[in-house]
Amino acid sequence: MVVGIEGIITKKEPTFIIVKCASGLSYGIFISLFCSAKIQTQEKHEFFITQIIKEDSNKFYGFLDKDEQKMFEMLLKVNGVGANTAMAVCSSLDVNSFYKALSLGDESVLKKVPGIGPKSAKRIIVELSDTKTKLENVSDDKSEALAALLTLGFKQEKIISVLVSAQATGTSELIKEALKKLG
């Protein structure tokens, strides 16, 4: 199983790249539009890879950060959501917007994604509505900040709503930002 690829981007399309590794091998990798906007050809990058092997294909889906990869993999667990739909969500919503929509149960955000209708949006919200699942898929810093804020007596749903939109990095910075917003 391939979990990461590092190399120079030799070809770039909006949602597909070819990366040439030091070994001389080149790999085709599907990427989100957010990822595409951050990279250029002839640049060296490292990608977190989700490999999907089917009877007739072996595809790589690449991500610059672990949170986007976790979001993609989480979407794949929803009935009726395949890799193309999951990648469309990753291309349309950043990680924070996605988790905020989940925590608020906001189907309208998901319905704006090409290929997601009312039924699919509802299914995604329902199947991924478990708060614990959402928290396992955010960074360790956010999980630690959540635990700290819970001990201070704040309500879990409010904390999650604040943390998914937080811009700070690092546990202490996240806690400070959340405390300002939670009052």
Curated annotation (Swiss-Prot):
Residues 139 are annotated as: Flexible linker. Homotetramer. Forms an RuvA(8)-RuvB(12)-Holliday junction (HJ) complex. HJ DNA is sandwiched between 2 RuvA tetramers; dsDNA enters through RuvA and exits via RuvB. An RuvB hexamer assembles on each DNA strand where it exits the tetramer. Each RuvB hexamer is contacted by two RuvA subunits (via domain III) on 2 adjacent RuvB subunits; this complex drives branch migration. In the full resolvosome a probable DNA-RuvA(4)-RuvB(12)-RuvC(2) complex forms which resolves the HJ. CDD domains: UBA_RuvA_C. HAMAP family: DNA_HJ_migration_RuvA. SMART domains: HhH1 (SM00278). Belongs to the RuvA family. This is Holliday junction branch migration complex subunit RuvA. Gene3D superfamilies: 5' to 3' exonuclease, C-terminal subdomain (1.10.150.20), DNA helicase RuvA subunit, C-terminal domain (1.10.8.10), Nucleic acid-binding proteins (2.40.50.140). Keywords: Cytoplasm, DNA damage, DNA recombination, DNA repair, DNA-binding. Residues 139-183 are annotated as: Domain III. SUPFAM superfamilies: DNA helicase RuvA subunit, C-terminal domain (SSF46929), Nucleic acid-binding proteins (SSF50249), RuvA domain 2-like (SSF47781). Residues 65-139 are annotated as: Domain II. Residues 1-64 are annotated as: Domain I. It is found in: Cytoplasm. InterPro entries: DNA_helicase_Holl-junc_RuvA_I, Hlx-hairpin-Hlx_DNA-bd_motif, NA-bd_OB-fold, RuvA, RuvA_2-like, RuvA_C, RuvA_C_sf. Has three domains with a flexible linker between the domains II and III and assumes an 'L' shape. Domain III is highly mobile and contacts RuvB. GO terms for biological process: DNA recombination; DNA repair. The keyword DNA repair applies. It comes from the Bacteria. The RuvA-RuvB-RuvC complex processes Holliday junction (HJ) DNA during genetic recombination and DNA repair, while the RuvA-RuvB complex plays an important role in the rescue of blocked DNA replication forks via replication fork reversal (RFR). RuvA specifically binds to HJ cruciform DNA, conferring on it an open structure. The RuvB hexamer acts as an ATP-dependent pump, pulling dsDNA into and through the RuvAB complex. HJ branch migration allows RuvC to scan DNA until it finds its consensus sequence, where it cleaves and resolves the cruciform DNA. One of its GO terms (molecular function) is ATP binding. GO terms for cellular component: cytoplasm; Holliday junction helicase complex; Holliday junction resolvase complex. The gene is ruvA.
